[in-house]
Amino acid sequence: MSTFASQNESKQSMKLNDIAEFVTDKISSSGISLDRYVTTDSLLQNRRGRETAQNLPPMPCALTHYRRGDVLVANIRPYLKKVWYADSEGGCSSDVLAFRVKNGHCPSFLYTVLMQDAFFDYAMSGAKGSKMPRGDKDQIMRYELPIFTPLEEENIGNMMVDIMSKINVNRQINDNLEAMAKQLYDYWFVQFDFLNEEGKPYKSSGGAMVWNEKLKREIPKGWNF
């Protein structure tokens, strides 16, 4: 995703720590449900948000207490571009950075900043470690971005949230269509339970099957490969 910074070269710049801070509030893992727990593994690559974590920590521990409107970014392997605009309250593991917008700035604008390729490239430029590079928190907060008015921030942020919402809806539609295609293929070419002339599943209703030497399996009578 292209950065908006190149379109605003004439604007003065500020640093990320001028509009945001790391969340330091804590919450016990025993005080949240699984669907409110966020880890680097539950954050999805390429700005796809998150999925439900596999499990809570085995022992009660302190987690970063994120809130609605915070922006969560996986700090391990920043090039994977794992970011989520929180729509709920919960806890996240220590390898997830939770950013909270400062007073006078727009949460959705912060999300727009932190989802840009330029931000992830910058985070990688200061990352430490080879196998599992980890972003440098001090360096991350020095990331530069253009200065916008509060109204401009709101307009930019709202536009990006709207775009990402549409992308996610389209992605869900595509996922559903793919699942339907796989199910249809399975019915036709694995189970051979496509509908016969009577509207019943072919094989399950006693449809004739013959051995195919090439495929080494039975197939519906009359089919050729």
Annotate each language-model stretch with its function.
Residues 11-12, 110, 139-183:
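Amphipathic alpha-helical segments
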Residues 57, 61, 165:
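Conserved aromatic-histidine-acidic binding/catalytic patches
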Residues 62-64, 68-117:
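A short beta-sheet element
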